[in-house]
């Protein structure tokens, strides 16, 4: 039986099915609904709100060190707060699987910037997984756990606003219980002194090479990466929600290499794919993260010179900029209602900000959502 779910609801289901035991999060659109949907699995998954993203990351990583599969979620600007433990975890590795959700927000629907957190995976030298629809949001959690434990790495699980909030049919599976060995003290692995970090860095680089090979082989078998060959005239390399747009826009016969494991890139697979098409496009939102690496490998491709660096993509934009077709925009002569952002219903800060709004003297506040107060 299939269920109609948002990407966030499906991710929560994926947490349950993957045998994850611990989940900690700090709320922030577009990621909030993941933890909100986990209490229904409370008999199998312990979940809690953390006071900030750094604490959420440390709670989950502590559970991983102890041997449990763990998961933490935050919006993309929250990863700035959590960067300290994340980078260190990249050197130390994991016990049980350790998954960190970063929900990016192209077009700034609910955020103060448009930062592209894919760069964090590259900087921290950890694996990154990107689902493109609700079914993959569920399925890829288990695959991310496989990657994490197989390669001893944290996994950055990157979604976007449209992936989080769009809905699709999701087919459920059964929970797979994860049994872990009892905690064993390992100072060299989990105490990141300078000497230990120095010794671990070569292992991190070796891990990236093994992940690249995995992306070319096993990831094709389990569906994390997908190859769809057409007539060989046009090829598209894409990931995340951009795949859904490209699949709808490009004509029949187009070849697609859809990447779910987007760091490190499976460059041998990409090079082989590029050799089989006459013209290669790289379709991605925000920064030319994949495009720059592909061009650096000496593979000619077309990307950001057409799609641009700003805002989220959509089907009309791709038709206009990539295919040169006239966009079929429809407008109405009605001014939209003014709807400034507001604090979410049930937010404990609503009363505080209401009180502040009634005071005329100067006030200074430091809450992230202060702009909504």
Regions found by a protein language model. Give the residues of each.
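Flexible, low-complexity linker and terminal segments
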Residues: 1-8, 18, 131-343, 348-352
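RNase H-like, Mg2+-dependent phosphodiesterase core
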Residues: 373
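Thiamine diphosphate
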Residues: 1-134, 160-162, 229-230, 253-256, ...
